[in-house]
Amino acid sequence: MKKQCFFEFASVFASSMSFILSILREMLEYFGVPINQILHIWENKDYGSARSIVRIIGKLLPLEPCPRPNFELVPLLNSVDPANCGSVVPSFADVWCVANDEEASYLRFRTWKNEEEEKIASFHPLQLFEGPLTPAVRRNKPRKNDWPESETAIKKIAALEDELAFLRSQIAAIVGRQELGNSTKAGFLDLNGRPSGFGQKPSSGATQLNVKQDSFSSSVRPSSPPPPSPPQISSVQPPCSPLMKIASNSICASDNSTTEVKQQHPDAGKTNYSHHSKNQKNEAVPNMLDVLKDMNKVKLRAIERSPGGRPIHKRKREDSPWDPVSLISHALKQKFAFQEEDSFEKEDNCWESSPFSSPETSRVRL
């Protein structure tokens, strides 16, 4: 029973397939297409296995192609030479020119490229558009549509730079004046051969002169204010008044008397100066409680190191000797070096070391 049903189904399927094949043959004969040509194309499979038989038949049939849509474009009204615009009907071939162009891509077609290649390279003042460029030339070509920087920002930056230069020049002038004053003061001390005001023991003549001068000043000024700080010595000296002349004469007389006392008692000045220097050293020693109180606030500086662990030393740039920054740094170094020479650790400053390293000791063989 099953075999009989199967045979009936196979006969129906074969009859239907034969009917379909007969219909296809009749259609091909009606259109004048030989069946041998279709079988040859099907066996070769020029278009692969995905090529459908409907496409093959449609290609072989003498059918008229469908009309393609044409997009009509209005030519440019402000164009200088409208005859050179080329075809105004775009197609898919124009996509490459549009994608590779950055300026006015909607006004350029593929036909313009050939025309630009044929023309001689010349500049026309009324030429509005240029031909398409290659990608290499386009990368090297500077952009024309870059927005300029705001003028207000440029003006602010220029004003800040001018103000900074003015401040640097002022600081350099102040430091120069201070160096000049220090040099003149050092020359004055060298001429006297001793620091003024230290270890002087006035004689009887000097005391009499001082008493006379005090009485004269008290008659002129009834209440004398506390002595002011010594002013800085400037290069331009004011005109001397009679009071200044009298004071200078008294100072010269006191200097002569003190020199005589020094010749008679040479050890007195040394003892007084040593006593004063000891007092100054004791006052300069800081209190350890104040130092230890701020130990928790100390922050170490991060040091850049190489992969091997050695610290990296930055190269010192060579500055001009007239640079304000170099002048200021040089003056500060001289100032702090002068202070370190007068410090109580003068005998221990024989080497230069970091504040975290221990002093090097010389090894003596026994």
From Swiss-Prot:
Chain segments carrying region Disordered: 191-240, 255-281, 305-324, 345-366
Stretches with biased composition (Polar residues): 201-214, 351-366
Keyword Mitochondrion applies: yes
Residue numbers bearing the Phosphoserine modification: 306, 343
Coiled-coil segments: 149-177
GO cellular component entries: mitochondrion
Biological processes annotated in GO: aerobic respiration; mitochondrial fission
Role noted for this protein: May play a role in mitochondrial aerobic respiration essentially in the testis. Can also promote mitochondrial fission.
Protein name: Mitochondrial fission regulator 2
Organism in which the protein naturally occurs: Bos taurus
